[in-house]
């Protein structure tokens, strides 16, 4: 049985004033309010989403 690798991300900047696609990416990662933390499966799809909004989030 393999264990899933996870990645924790925290929203550190407000998505107000950003592109609509970036706001949708923030919501897609499960982040809502400022400083909210989400733990997700570490996959290429999630890594791409994090890379897209790297200026808004911090990887913990």
From Swiss-Prot:
Pfam families linked: Ribosomal_L30
Keywords: Ribonucleoprotein, Ribosomal protein
Keyword Ribosomal protein recorded: yes
Gene Ontology BP term (one): translation
Record-linked CDD domains: Ribosomal_L30
InterPro entries: Ribo_uL30_ferredoxin-like_sf, Ribosomal_uL30_bac-type, Ribosomal_uL30_ferredoxin-like
Quaternary state and interactors: Part of the 50S ribosomal subunit.
Family of this protein: Belongs to the universal ribosomal protein uL30 family.
Name of the featured protein: Large ribosomal subunit protein uL30
Protein species of origin: Paracidovorax citrulli (strain AAC00-1)
């Amino acid at each position: 049985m393999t264990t899933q690798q996870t990645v924790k991300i925290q929203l550190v900047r407000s998505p107000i004033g950003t592109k609509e696609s970036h706001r949708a990416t923030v919501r897609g990662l499960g982040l809502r309010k400022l400083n909210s933390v989400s733990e997700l499966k570490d996959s290429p799809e999630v890594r791409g989403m994090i890379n897209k909004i790297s200026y808004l989030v911090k990887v913990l």
